[in-house]
Amino acid sequence: MRKLNSSKLVALLIGTAVIFLILVTSVSAQAKLTERSKLAINGIGPIRVGMAVDEASKSAGIRLIRSGSGDLDEYQCFYVQPKGEPKGIAFMVTKGRIARVDISNKRITTISGARIGDNENRILSLYPGQIKATPHPYVSRPPDNGKYLTLVPKDAADKNYRIIFETSKNRVERFRSGKLPEVEYIEGCS
């Protein structure tokens, strides 16, 4: 009788340990920034607009490094990107905080499934009644006929955020999300 109880106890402990490991692995996999992370109107995966760079790095389980041009003053405008993977994600930083997320990776999608390569009609169908189309400032003339397809949210809580899809020849070439006014800066920090 005593062996049976200790066998049950061992089985229970092993079962509990396995469940715990599965849960921990699942939670940590969800928290890490990857190509499977979804772009939202206010961030991507675990990174949110308004986070400090160190906070975003810890939240996403990655190291963010400074990239490209921008002012050397940390309270002005500059970009950071993941060191290593995932590629094709850049975070604009203004006043020491993440202000927008720029996507050039074809594998990354929005929460609704929009991605690079989608045609304009698909974007319109994913966000019915929420897209404002304007001419692209650089490629609006034929043959490119480029546009900015800007998601203007219906929810009052999101009124200061946008997702902007840049198109050329009827296809999304890149997209970004973030807060106003930074999300609308045509040339990033330039």
Which positions does each model-derived feature cover?
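The feature marks the first
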Residues: T34-K38, N42-A56
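A cross-family detector of function-defining hotspots
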Residues: A31, M51-T94, R115, E120-I186
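Second-shell loop/turn segments in exported
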Residues: A40-P46, R107-A114
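Short, solvent-exposed mixed-charge patches
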Residues: G188-S190
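Sec/Tat signal peptide C-region and signal peptidase I cleavage site
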Residues: T25-Q30
